[in-house]
Amino acid sequence: MRDNTQHYRELFLDDIPLMDVRAPVEYHKGAFPNTVNRPLMNDIERQKVGTSYKQHGQQAAIALGHELVCGALKAERLAAWKAFAEANPNGYLYCFRGGLRSQIVQQWLKQDAGIDYPRVIGGYKALRNFLFETTRAAVDECDFVLVGGLTGCGKTEVIAALDNSLDLEGHANHRGSSFGRRATPQPAQIDFENRLAIDILKKRHRGVGQFVLEDEGRIVGSCSLPLELYQGMQGYPLVWLEDAFEQRVERILRDYVIDLRSEFERVVGVEEGFAAFSAYLQKSLAGIVKRLGGERYQRLAAILVQALEEQGRDGSVDTHRGWIEGLLKEYYDPMYAFQRQSKEDRVEFRGNQAEVIGYLRQRQALRPS
């Protein structure tokens, strides 16, 4: 039998498959990549056992757990654990603290299926703490630089072009603006933090000591950046990306209209997808009505409605440029100009996309760690 493990670093670096035997309610609050939920108890069973533990102690709770998970139900769950173990001979299982639940699953696998399967010592809590410390250590020990620029200038493309970048919006599955929602849901907060930490861990393992981030607010959709990282971002040097207004409009048209419509249609089907996409754009615009002001909002909303009608009818996207241009000129650009004033002393380079990518690569080569 392979030994139980405390080698948390290797689990994440090597993408080792993990079986989470916690209840679904625990799993959905946060877990790890390469993990599947094969619970010992469902949510109701867990609640009953927890109540018994509080009222009557550990032995009574264990006895109740064995009563609740027995017979055909036990056989069904055992079959799921057995299937995972056979499909993932290099994997591990874990519960919240690496205690009774994971030990019981180990015992049942051994007794009833003849399978020795190791667990993660310390369980979910130890893995989570390890990743938390991974992010904290990077903030303390590494060099960071931010990429800023006006809406639509292509900051995400710069992040994608660099091998030492951390894609905050990618990990959050959100573009970070009022219009940033994707067709698929955002991860849970803990999942977002875990994905980011694993990204940091893998890049540091490859020797990266200098990271490039997009200049973000604290909240990316519904995901909050780790506090230590966000606090550091208030002082990190800034590289400012520039692009022509017309190019920015075309990029937004591509990303937020053409590609996003296709994304919604892939997820929920053509007819429902276009309806969901249309509702998303209109809701996003309505979400900033107070900041736009009533008259401006009504004018841009009318252009958006007309644009969606034309797009739905014949696929034309030309009218979308009207509300995009209006939002940039009358809302986003003035807002960014105001915010940039407080960051001006941190700007160490300005340039177009090719120049910024070249500068950041040179910066990494000169100061790799």
Curated annotation (Swiss-Prot):
Residues 12-136 form the Rhodanese domain. Keywords: Selenium, Transferase. It comes from the Bacteria. It is an enzyme of class 2 (transferase). Its EC number is 2.9.1.3. It catalyses: 5-methylaminomethyl-2-thiouridine(34) in tRNA + selenophosphate + (2E)-geranyl diphosphate + H2O + H(+) = 5-methylaminomethyl-2-selenouridine(34) in tRNA + (2E)-thiogeraniol + phosphate + diphosphate; 5-methylaminomethyl-2-thiouridine(34) in tRNA + (2E)-geranyl diphosphate = 5-methylaminomethyl-S-(2E)-geranyl-thiouridine(34) in tRNA + diphosphate; 5-methylaminomethyl-S-(2E)-geranyl-thiouridine(34) in tRNA + selenophosphate + H(+) = 5-methylaminomethyl-2-(Se-phospho)selenouridine(34) in tRNA + (2E)-thiogeraniol; 5-methylaminomethyl-2-(Se-phospho)selenouridine(34) in tRNA + H2O = 5-methylaminomethyl-2-selenouridine(34) in tRNA + phosphate. The active site is at residue 95. GO terms for biological process: tRNA wobble uridine modification. GO terms for molecular function: transferase activity, transferring alkyl or aryl (other than methyl) groups; tRNA 2-selenouridine synthase activity. Belongs to the SelU family. Involved in the post-transcriptional modification of the uridine at the wobble position (U34) of tRNA(Lys), tRNA(Glu) and tRNA(Gln). Catalyzes the conversion of 2-thiouridine (S2U-RNA) to 2-selenouridine (Se2U-RNA). Acts in a two-step process involving geranylation of 2-thiouridine (S2U) to S-geranyl-2-thiouridine (geS2U) and subsequent selenation of the latter derivative to 2-selenouridine (Se2U) in the tRNA chain. Monomer. This is tRNA 2-selenouridine synthase. It comes from Pseudomonas aeruginosa (strain ATCC 15692 / DSM 22644 / CIP 104116 / JCM 14847 / LMG 12228 / 1C / PRS 101 / PAO1). The lineage of its organism: Bacteria, Pseudomonadati, Pseudomonadota, Gammaproteobacteria, Pseudomonadales.
